[in-house]
Amino acid sequence: ADAWTDDAMLGAGFSGAWAELRESYRLPADFIQLVRDFAQQFIQTEKRIEPENVPIQQELDTQTTRLKWIQTSPMDVISVCVDSVLAMPLRARNQDPLVYPDIVIMAENNKAGFEIVKRLGNKGIKVKHTFGHSGDGKDKELSRKQKMSFFIGSEQVKATTIHSFKGWESTCLLVHISKASSATDFAAIYTALTRLKASEYGYDSYLTVVCSAPELAEYGKTWSA
């Protein structure tokens, strides 16, 4: 029940219908090429399904995607995630009402996610999360209940794992990456990137990636090219 993938996704494949992004009605138009670039570089050809078409209505929109890729060290990755969450509302334009409850944190694993939540709490930022009491994965029943109520009436920052966010999407994401060495890792990262959606109200979308995996450093540089 805790698996992030359907049977069709086993082996890092993308044959399941949920991952078919050839017509990208939810991805921001100005982000699609970066997603395609990631897929072409890191996903096996026979497993790859890329977003291709940009709907006409998105082409005409004035909204932009505010992208930030932060390459950092394993020692600093958690603190950089925390600082990035705190800075997110400051990046919004005056006409874009971005507030903390809009932010979704997607952590690579429960342990890292719980540490991010704890440090944000120390700074006065409340977070609704799915990491249980300690992030060690042992209190599965509590974690299950947290997942059931994740988006119900939450006026807080939200945090979960990449694996648990399947089926959801958000206009404001922070993604934590520390591992990028296997096909499964790359599939999970692709999943995380494609959880970003365009705002239906014409506001900007926000995606910050905090990465300590050296394998992605060169790709990350293309976000600011």
Locate the predicted segments by residue:
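Conserved helicase motor core of SF1/SF2 NTP-dependent helicases
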Residues: 1-225
